[in-house]
Swiss-Prot record:
Localization of this protein: Cytoplasm, Cytoskeleton; Cell projection, Filopodium
Lineage of origin: Eukaryota, Metazoa, Chordata, Craniata, Vertebrata
Top-level taxon of origin: Eukaryota
Region described as Actin filament-binding: spans on this chain: 1-150
Binding positions for Zn(2+) 2 per the UniProt entry: C582, C585, C611, C614
Annotated Gene Ontology cellular component terms: cytoplasm; cytoskeleton; filopodium; lamellipodium
The protein's name: FYVE, RhoGEF and PH domain-containing protein 4
Main location: cytoplasm
Amino acid sequence: MEESNPAPTSCTSKGKHSKVSDLISHFEGGSVLSSYIDLQKDSTMNLNIPQTLGQPGLTSSPPRKFLPQHSPQKQENDPDQTQGQHGCLANGVVAAQNQMECEDEKETTLSPEMAIQTAAASPDTHVLNGERNETITDSASSIANSHDENASDSSCRTPGTDLGLPSKEGEPGMDAELQERENGVNTMGLDTLDQHHEVKETNEQKLHKIATELLLTERAYVSRLDLLDQVFYCKLLEEANRGSFPAEMVNKIFSNISSINAFHSKFLLPELEKRMQEWETTPRIGDILQKLAPFLKMYGEYVKGFDNAVELVKTMTERVPQFKSVTEEIQKQKICGSLTLQHHMLEPIQRIPRYEMLLKDYLKKLSPDSPDWNDAKKSLEIISTAASHSNSAIRKMENLKKLLEIYEMLGEEEDIVNPSNELIKEGQILKLAARNTSAQERYLFLFNNMLLYCVPRFSLVGSKFTVRTRVGIDGMKIVETHNEEYPHTFQISGKERTLELQASSEQDKEEWIKALQESIDAFHQRHETFRNAIAKENDIPLEVSTAELGKRAPRWIRDNEVTMCMKCKESFNALTRRRHHCRACGHVVCWKCSDYKAQLEYDGGRLNKVCKDCYQIISGFTDSEEKKRRGILEIESAEVSGNSEVCSFLQYMEKSKPWQKIWCVIPKQDPLVLYMYGAPQDVRAQATIPLLGYVVDDMPKSADLPHSFKLTQSKSVHSFAADNEELKQKWLKIILLAVTGETPDGPSEHLATLNNLPGPKKKSEC
């Protein structure tokens, strides 16, 4: 980089020998005083330019006429020449200033008109996409050329050099007067420069800059797409074809990245390149971006599968060494920029919002009368819709990135990396011991569904915390406590543990209580909404029951769908407790619970056998409030089966007992518990298994039951067997999440399976 001004040392030792000779001849040919006056004129003119451009946001270099004639390398290597220079930093660009002093009172300064012309002629430096583009006008050079070249060289001298000029002590007050003049002239120059700069920012030049930025970022984006498509995807597919892992997994990770890459590299980028070459005759980009709209569907498919793709990369990296080896080898290359595969996979998600941002800026600078206005506006409307989906995926990715950081801080012991987990708050806190009330340092991570209570781990490398307790939000209560000895305390009471904590200040305490309470309320609201939706579908409220019951024939529950009375929950047997149907609600009940008769409107008002609940509603007889709230169509197993993560018949064996066929359900509202029923319509579960903490063994031990798996915890052993491998994998997918405290966030597919079955008797899986 060239120096803006020469150092204020003697130019006789720095300039070329020819310049020195000319300068000496110039002074020998006339009086010293007249030469000095000419010198001061040029010096004053040169002085005004850096003074004007020393403002923030403006950068300049002096006219070429005043630049030193020796090489830049010599300037950098010579320590004497750098003395006395002052660099001002303005928007990342250094503008050098060289302050010179003048002594002669007879010296004439620049007129305001010439100062304005000089300031306006200063070059503007703009930073665009990391590159500097400088436009230097010739006005400053023309001003410099109007004076003698030798005088410009001699202006390098400072007062008091060996030319015998008057000393600066001989002219008191001259510096102040000259500075005053310079300030007045430079103020006018600044105003004119700002106006000139403003005019430039509002014309088509700014539109050209936006289009240029679009082109440059598109080039960088295509290179990232090529990295994903031609490097990561191809290398992993080659490894998959060797049999290291299924090629289907690679296709799921990269989705339609090849199609996206082909569109941008073969169509959009060449179109932008061509348009920028023809910008003088066709200054528009809206028509090109409008052609992008039909191809946004490709991004919709990519965004839709992004969460699963990132999760699959994590799983494959942990479980398949060959996959991990290939990805790490590529990530070490310079082209990756020390970023992981997951970071590069985010590039297509981030690109659509980038188009939206550039188009918005483009429309702000574009005149409504422009022929490109309609195309640009229509493009923005279409791209904005796609950008909203991309922004949602970006937020999820940022959340997932934060979860990965916490996962590493916890020593990779707590499997919290799940898109359904959202970090609400984290921070240091003190825990009051129950025995001696001493305060102990702890760290909390609050998520939308749990609280991690951690202890600091003192180690030089690796994890920072150890999880002491995982407290679920479900059932959690917050109590503000008052302790005179320990202020700012509050209590967290959960199913797993109760903690008395001390915040650092009253504000910190209020923030924690607020965050915890909002998380609890949001959790209950989600589950309450879910339960209300189930109640509307499966239960008949009292008012509706009174109006509808007996007026419409019910659907009878099949006998083989229950093993116990749906009212008193007593088991059926062939001799003493047989099955009966209530003609009003269709439930299967025992003889004790069906020993009632009521007139049913749909049967012409004839008396029919009904259950006790239906009799109470039809006849108007009321029982206790508790029985009222139960409802007459409450079917426990059917309720959870119809809204479950997975449900089907499985073979079950506990310890050395024989295998038996049972109906198993993991409900959505309680996804960490496995419910086991005798039949799909039973109102009471035979047993439940809290899955959290169990160890899953999916290796079959028996040739007779090849699709079996086992759950083990301490001395408890539960063995299950599915009818086929597909059903087994569906169960294992949900159970493997549940044993680590995680819940599936995607919609379950069992409802579609149920809808395709001809009748309730064939509820083999869901």
